[in-house]
């Protein structure tokens, strides 16, 4: 028998004995190895027995022997590959843990050599990168030799694979795993331009990761049912997984914290003017403002260095705080446990003073049954005031019940605005920031456009805000699936109310009403009218005039519909109380004044005075929409001798009836009787839900309402 045949016989005999007598099998193999020490199959069979018996130390020694003595055997490398895969695996099963333990028994030098050789045999870029990353983590001394090369390979792979989003497996491995190893190792020498390149890549990745649902999740989840303003977008509870990575590897804890740590390390390596210790975002911004003041005093090299410091520091403060603001007012855009429960908010001009600016001589006309409370508070300022002043410190009214962390949210809004202003305050900052934004395609970020729109509204630049809202609509169209007819998205409804508030601030009252009336189609009824304004409890009254205040309102029918009615009242009020007679506008005002009664009582009395001065009044929709008992009593009184015998044409076709017939005592009496019966019927309607009545008014009379403002 040949030597090869002898070896095969001995190995086969040992295999047969394994199930019956393990020790006998091992004895056969020990004998065989003594006889044929250069035979690989004998060594491998011994290793297999020990591995299957999960004897870590013995299996490790045998694997080491094979690695040293038979380095060219494919079976050895297949075994090593299985072990290194277990090292990268998140699984905690028994077999995986055994393989990890087996690897740990090997000498460090051998581990390092094994990982390097396995890496060389990987043809898949991602697998090769993960293998090399394993080496860098276990043997930090290898970072100097392999760290930058691995980082560049990952960035190159991202380009070659034509990844659409910065949130991809290659960028994630580079930013979260490789980059910290490189920049925190002071033996790795990196030029400043490479550090800035890496900081840029990290910032783009983390910002897109945090805000990823805006661009990614909506595409996968399709149309969302947002038939009511009140309903935040429904969201998937499934965890986000980056393609090519495991679920565990895709989750990043404290991404903002990680990003600012990278900023600090890069800053120290580039010799920026750094502060010791942890500083708030406000402190960072303040420091950057100071640095900008004496930028021109530096030589060109220092100027370039500090320019990068200001741009990157301010930019990250901007994006962090802009995100914080949008995440608080519209959490459904982003992932998070609070997303389904919190109602979104929308920033609008405050028109709650719509009932003000009325000066009345009460002695001219006071109903005998009406006693006005002497101490009733009057609103001091008027919505007619110029609200478009581009103030830097406008007051934002917000109800803490609707936004518990309102102080922090408004502070984030302020810091983001100031950061934005700083980035555009100097030409060289503007140029660099614009370059970065173009590369990152920030004009496609829906969440950022929401912030920018609110910022522009805050600044009082309403024409720009309208353009921004149209940009927002275009973004929503490119991201969202087509909606079911009649179910406008939450974003579409937010845009309508913000368009209305901007047109109003510009004095474009017909456009204001057009947007408001479009929005009325989305209102979900019934809404209870509690008499008092919905925003009244939340109002914190500033010491100075509040003509240019803003407010954050919940995106619910209950909050938005009263606001819409305020806007309409403000539009028609201006037309109704001019010197020119406009009974239609005056009638619309009277209908709208029913909301929050008796807050609009003074304005109603002004309307009554105007009617008295005219001596007559025609509004044929009166009995369709006026159900307020005080108003009905007042109009009934106007027809009496004591009330001035005012000629009122409030019934449909009443004018035609009188015009086309000879006015006889009988017909006049008939008209009076019709008026009396209509008034009695109307009194019986006083219990109707006022919001339903006013909603019907807006829907049914849309054409008439818009014609009145033409």
Swiss-Prot record:
Protein name per Swiss-Prot or TrEMBL: Integrator complex subunit 10
Family per record: Belongs to the Integrator subunit 10 family.
Keyword annotations: Isopeptide bond, Nucleus, Phosphoprotein, Ubl conjugation
Cellular component GO terms, alphabetical: INTAC complex; integrator complex; nucleoplasm; nucleus
Cross-link (Glycyl lysine isopeptide (Lys-Gly) (interchain with G-Cter in SUMO2)): 464
UniProt KW Nucleus keyword: yes
Assembly information from the UniProt record: Component of the Integrator complex, composed of core subunits INTS1, INTS2, INTS3, INTS4, INTS5, INTS6, INTS7, INTS8, INTS9/RC74, INTS10, INTS11/CPSF3L, INTS12, INTS13, INTS14 and INTS15. The core complex associates with protein phosphatase 2A subunits PPP2CA and PPP2R1A, to form the Integrator-PP2A (INTAC) complex. INTS10 is part of the tail subcomplex, composed of INTS10, INTS13, INTS14 and INTS15.
InterPro entries: Int_cplx_su10 (IPR026164)
Subcellular location, principal: nucleus
GO BP, sorted A to Z: regulation of transcription elongation by RNA polymerase II; RNA polymerase II transcription initiation surveillance; snRNA processing
Top-level taxonomic group: Eukaryota
Record organism: Homo sapiens
Location of Phosphoserine modifications: 231, 381-382
Subcellular location: Nucleus
Record's function text: Component of the integrator complex, a multiprotein complex that terminates RNA polymerase II (Pol II) transcription in the promoter-proximal region of genes.
């Amino acid at each position: 028998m040949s030597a090869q045949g002898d070896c095969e016989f001995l190995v086969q005999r040992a295999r047969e004995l394994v199930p019956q007598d393990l020790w006998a099998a091992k004895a056969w193999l020990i004998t065989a190895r003594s006889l044929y020490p250069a035979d690989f199959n004998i060594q491998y069979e011994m290793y297999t027995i020990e591995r299957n018996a999960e004897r870590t130390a013995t299996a490790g020694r045998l694997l080491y022997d094979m690695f040293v003595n038979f380095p060219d055997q494919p079976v050895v490398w297949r075994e090593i590959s299985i072990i290194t895969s277990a090292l990268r695996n998140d699984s905690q099963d028994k077999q995986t843990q055994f393989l990890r333990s087996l690897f740990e028994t090997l000498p460090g030098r051998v581990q390092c050599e094994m990982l390097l050789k396995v890496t060389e045999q990987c043809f898949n870029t991602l697998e090769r990168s993960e293998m090399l990353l394993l080496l860098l983590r276990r043997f930090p001394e290898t970072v100097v030799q392999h760290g930058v090369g691995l980082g560049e390979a990952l960035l190159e792979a991202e380009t070659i694979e034509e990844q659409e989003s910065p949130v991809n497996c290659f960028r994630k491995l580079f930013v979260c795993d490789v980059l910290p190893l490189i920049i925190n190792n002071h033996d790795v020498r990196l030029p400043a331009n490479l550090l800035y390149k890496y900081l840029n890549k990290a910032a783009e990745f983390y910002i897109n990761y945090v805000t990823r649902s805006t661009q990614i999740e909506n595409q996968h989840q399709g149309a969302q049912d947002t038939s009511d303003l009140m309903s935040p977008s429904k969201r998937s509870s499934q965890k986000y997984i980056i393609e090519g990575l495991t679920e565990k590897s895709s989750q990043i804890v404290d991404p903002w914290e990680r990003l600012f740590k990278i900023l600090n390390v890069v800053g120290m390596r580039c010799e920026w003017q750094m502060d010791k210790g942890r500083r708030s975002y406000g402190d960072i911004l303040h420091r950057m403002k100071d640095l900008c003041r004496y930028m021109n005093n530096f030589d060109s090299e220092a100027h370039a260095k500090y320019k990068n410091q200001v741009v990157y520091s301010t930019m990250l403060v901007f994006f962090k705080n802009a995100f914080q603001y949008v995440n608080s007012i519209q959490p459904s855009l982003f992932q998070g446990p609070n997303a389904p429960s919190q109602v979104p908010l929308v920033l609008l001009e405050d028109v709650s003073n719509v009932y003000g600016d009325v000066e009345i001589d009460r002695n001219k006309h006071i109903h005998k049954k009406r006693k006005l409370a002497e101490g009733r508070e009057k609103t001091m300022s008027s919505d007619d005031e110029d609200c478009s002043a581009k103030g830097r410190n406008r007051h934002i009214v917000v109800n803490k019940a609707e936004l518990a962390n309102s102080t922090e949210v408004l502070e984030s809004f302020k810091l983001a605005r100031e950061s934005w202003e700083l980035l555009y305050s100097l030409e060289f900052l503007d140029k660099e920031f614009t370059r970065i934004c173009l590369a990152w395609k920030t004009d496609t970020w829906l969440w950022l456009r929401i912030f920018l729109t609110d910022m522009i509204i805050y600044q009082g630049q309403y024409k720009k805000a309208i353009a921004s809202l149209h940009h927002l609509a275009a973004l929503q169209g490119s991201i969202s699936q087509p909606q079911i007819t009649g179910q406008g998205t939450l974003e579409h409804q937010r845009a309508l109310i913000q368009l209305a508030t901007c047109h109003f601030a510009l004095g474009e009252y017909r456009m204001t009403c057009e947007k408001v009336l479009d929005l009325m189609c989305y209102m979900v009824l019934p809404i209870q009218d509690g008499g008092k304004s919905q925003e009244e409890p939340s109002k914190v009254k500033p010491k100075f005039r509040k003509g240019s205040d803003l407010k954050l309102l919940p995106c619910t029918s209950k909050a938005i519909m009263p606001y819409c009615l305020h806007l309409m009242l403000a539009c028609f009020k201006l037309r109704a109380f001019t010197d020119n007679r406009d009974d239609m506008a005056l009638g619309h005002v009277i209908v709208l004044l029913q909301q929050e009664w008796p807050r609009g009582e003074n304005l109603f009395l002004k309307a009554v005075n105007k009617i008295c001065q005219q001596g007559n009044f025609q509004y044929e929709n009166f009995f369709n929409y006026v159900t307020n008992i005080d108003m009905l009593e007042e109009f009934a009184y106007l027809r009496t001798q004591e009330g001035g015998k005012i000629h009122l044409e409030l019934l449909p076709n009443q004018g035609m009836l009188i015009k086309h017939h000879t006015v006889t005592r009988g017909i006049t009496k008939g008209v009076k009787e019709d008026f009396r019966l209509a008034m009695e019927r109307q009194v019986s309607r006083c219990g109707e839900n006022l919001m339903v009545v006013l909603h019907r008014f807006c829907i049914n009379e849309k054409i008439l309402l818009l014609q009145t403002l033409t």
